[in-house]
């Protein structure tokens, strides 16, 4: 059976200091107008720089469960526990980024987390764009 529509979703960012979004409501409006077979879902968020209502007015559906999505968009790394098997994600993983950390312990913790994230991505057969 051939799917007649394509689904994208915007995740709720997990980091406390992150309020950005990969798409503005205006961009969602342009996409849904141009591609009527595109379904857009947005996980609800109180801290995102755009309101859920603005996304809804632009044609997105506000929904916590985005497991049905073809591509899941985010800004920062998705929490390991929130990764969905066999999905395609587009977010900045910084998995190979080298930076100066405040101390060695902080750097070691970041490296361990990034390795764990990559292992889980491979284990869950996730495509990371």
Question: What is each residue range found by the language model?
Answer:
Residues 45, 67, 94:
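Residues that form or immediately flank small-molecule/cofactor binding pockets and catalytic motifs
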Residues 1-61:
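N-terminal glycine-/charge-rich "phosphate-binding" loop or analogous flexible N-terminal tail
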Residues 71-129:
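Phosphate/diphosphate ligand-binding glycine-rich loop within oxidoreductases
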Residues 1-2, 64-66, 82-84:
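Solvent-exposed alpha-helices and their adjacent loops that cap or buttress functional pockets
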Residues 58-69, 78:
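Short acidic low-complexity segments
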């Amino acid at each position: 059976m051939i799917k007649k529509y394509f689904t994208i979703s915007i995740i709720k960012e997990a980091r406390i200091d992150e309020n950005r979004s990969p798409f503005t409501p205006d961009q969602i409006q342009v996409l849904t107008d141009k591609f009527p077979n595109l379904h857009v879902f947005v996980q609800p968020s109180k801290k995102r720089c755009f309101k859920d209502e603005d996304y809804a007015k632009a044609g997105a559906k506000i929904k916590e469960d985005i497991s049905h999505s073809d591509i899941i968009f985010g800004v920062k790394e998705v929490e390991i526990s929130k990764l969905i098997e066999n999905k395609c994600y587009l977010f900045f993983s910084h998995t190979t980024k080298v930076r100066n950390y405040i101390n060695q312990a902080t750097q070691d913790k970041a490296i361990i987390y990034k390795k764990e994230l990559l292992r889980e991505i491979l284990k869950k057969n996730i495509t990371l764009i």
